[in-house]
């Protein structure tokens, strides 16, 4: 029984010892900076050498002026980097002692670097791959960095075998930067990502700029093509107008070659026809009284169309100037930035304006043609010229004014002339001779009708600044195709005394026949002018 008790007591003692030893192994031991001075004497000595090198006045503490001078002279730092390191080194303490410097190094992350991290720092940041093998062989970690940075240490020469003073100085400065101010990762991923994003954004902006510039160039080319088409239409319109003027001139020249005999016969026939119309009709003077009103209406309508055409030419000139300004502004930096940002461009307004101008010119051209056809038809129905006055304008106006504004006087005179024809056969011939005016030379046988707009408009060309004056010179011989038998019967009837009245009554329908022949003539002329 006593032996069993001893065995149990020995077993319990062994378990207690094992538990106590296990607790000691897993316990986390905290080492202070003061204790670390004793454990890492060489590191503390290196920190003290660095502090002594920075303390110029040997007061036992490093102020801001001393740290600034050390960074400028020994570490060759300038600008914002020096300011950043100075603020990190001092913080809120303007006097840094040896213990402060040792505690800052003791609590730094760089002191816990492993051998692999130290080798990576030597390769990537210091760029000294030649000493990597020696560092790996000696299994050096981050605690050795103060000895690298110490100005009085022979560790670099003796332990690592660095013979080059340039390499030693390079390693010393980099180690001093890490010990005093901490490690700064130059390969900042955030910066790389930001730079990549900016590069992508710049590439996208350049692509959009090129795309918008191509679209703008394409739109300008389209506008230029449309403007060229508009100019072609203008040229065609002017050519047609010129052809029309040439045709009118040719007709006036061809009609002006009428000989002296035909002109005399024409005047005699007109005189006789008007006498018969006044003697044998009651209240039939309305068509002749309507003639000046219709002519005035025709002139006003043609002047309005001419005004519309001049306005169209003016807007066409403004469109050309706008396209020229758009082409000049295309190469400017401001225009390129507007195109890149997708701002509204004025080219859409120019495009719509050119389309509206084109449609308006076509409408004016169609309306002008329809107006000419309509007035030619009115001429055919009325039997007197309205659109283009001929050489008989003065005769017709004098007849209309004398017979309708002095109706009572002329009515009595015409009836007296007929009664005198019964008693005096030669009276008719004398009246005919008195009213026949001298023949008009061929050069003066045409009358000109000028359509002048009420307001001066600028045309599309610089030489068209004067108002457009359109000379219309087409002579109309109302009785060119009258038969010789009708003329002879009128003249013979006037010379036969008592038979003159019967002859006049027999030829009573000559003036309506004259109107019918004039209608066919006007229709043929209207078809040709169109």
Swiss-Prot record:
Disruption phenotype: Sterility due to dysfunction of somatic cells. Affects the store-operated Ca(2+) (SOC) activity. Residues 411-424 have a biased composition (Low complexity). Coexpressed with orai-1 in spermatheca, gonad sheath cells and intestine. Also detected in neurons in the head and in the uterine epithelial cells. Heterogeneously expressed in the intestine with strong presence in the anterior and posterior intestine and weaker in the midsection. Residues 208-329 form a coiled coil. Homodimer. Interacts with orai-1. Plays a role in mediating store-operated Ca(2+) entry (SOCE), a Ca(2+) influx following depletion of intracellular Ca(2+) stores. Acts as a Ca(2+) sensor which upon Ca(2+) depletion, activates the Ca(2+) release-activated Ca(2+) (CRAC) channel subunit, orai-1. Essential for Ca (2+) and IP3-dependent contractile activity of gonad sheath cells and spermatheca. Essential for fertility. Does not play a role in posterior body wall muscle contraction (pBoc) rhythmicity, intestinal cell oscillatory Ca(2+) signaling or intestinal ER Ca(2+) hemostasis. This is Stromal interaction molecule 1. It comes from Caenorhabditis elegans. The gene is stim-1.
């Amino acid at each position: 029984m006593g032996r069993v008790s001893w065995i149990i007591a020995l077993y319990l003692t062994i378990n207690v010892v094992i538990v106590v030893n296990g607790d000691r192994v897993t316990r986390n031991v905290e080492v202070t900076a003061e204790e670390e001075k004793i454990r890492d004497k060489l590191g503390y000595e290196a920190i003290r050498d660095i502090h002594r090198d920075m303390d110029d006045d040997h007061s036992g503490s490093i102020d801001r002026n001393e740290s600034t001078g050390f960074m400028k002279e020994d570490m060759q730092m300038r600008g914002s980097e020096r300011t950043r390191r100075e603020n990190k080194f001092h913080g809120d303490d303007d006097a840094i002692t040896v213990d402060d410097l040792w505690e800052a190094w003791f609590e730094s992350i760089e002191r816990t670097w492993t051998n692999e991290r130290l080798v990576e720092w030597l390769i990537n940041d210091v760029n000294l791959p030649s000493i990597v093998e020696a560092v790996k062989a000696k299994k050096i970690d981050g605690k050795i960095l103060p000895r690298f940075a110490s100005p009085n240490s022979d560790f670099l020469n003796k332990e690592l075998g660095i013979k080059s003073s340039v390499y030693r100085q390079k390693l010393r400065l980099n180690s001093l930067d890490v010990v005093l101010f901490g490690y700064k990762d130059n390969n900042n991923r955030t910066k790389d990502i930001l730079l990549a994003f900016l590069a992508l954004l710049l590439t996208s902006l350049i692509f959009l700029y090129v795309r918008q510039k191509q679209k703008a160039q394409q739109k300008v080319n389209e506008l230029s093509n449309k403007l060229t088409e508009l100019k072609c239409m203008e040229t065609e319109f002017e050519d047609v107008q010129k052809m029309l003027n040439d045709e009118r001139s040719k007709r006036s020249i061809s009609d002006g070659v009428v000989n002296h005999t035909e002109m005399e016969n024409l005047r005699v026939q007109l005189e006789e026809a008007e006498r018969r119309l006044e003697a044998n009709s009651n209240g039939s003077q309305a068509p002749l009284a309507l003639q000046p009103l219709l002519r005035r209406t025709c002139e006003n309508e043609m002047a309005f169309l001419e005004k519309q055409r001049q306005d169209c030419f003016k807007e066409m000139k403004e469109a050309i100037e706008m396209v020229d300004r758009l082409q000049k502004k295309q190469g400017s930096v401001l225009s390129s930035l507007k195109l890149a940002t997708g701002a509204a461009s004025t080219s859409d307004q120019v495009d719509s304006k050119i389309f509206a101008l084109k449609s308006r010119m076509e409408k004016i051209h169609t309306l002008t043609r329809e107006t000419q056809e309509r007035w030619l038809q009115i001429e055919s129905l009325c039997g007197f010229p309205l659109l283009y006055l001929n050489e008989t304008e003065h005769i017709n106006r004098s007849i209309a004014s004398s017979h309708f504004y002095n109706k009572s006087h002329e009515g009595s005179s015409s009836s007296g002339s007929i009664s005198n024809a019964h008693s005096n056969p030669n009276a008719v011939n004398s009246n005919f001779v008195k009213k026949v005016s001298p023949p008009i030379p061929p050069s003066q046988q045409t009358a000109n009708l000028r359509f002048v707009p009420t307001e001066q408009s600028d045309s599309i060309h610089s030489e068209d600044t004067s108002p457009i004056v359109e000379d219309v010179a087409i002579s109309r011989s109302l009785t060119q195709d009258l038969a010789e038998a009708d003329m002879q019967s009128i003249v013979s009837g006037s010379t036969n005394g008592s038979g003159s009245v019967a002859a006049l009554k027999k030829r009573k329908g000559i003036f309506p026949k004259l109107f019918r022949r004039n209608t066919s003539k006007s229709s043929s002329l209207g078809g040709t002018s169109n």
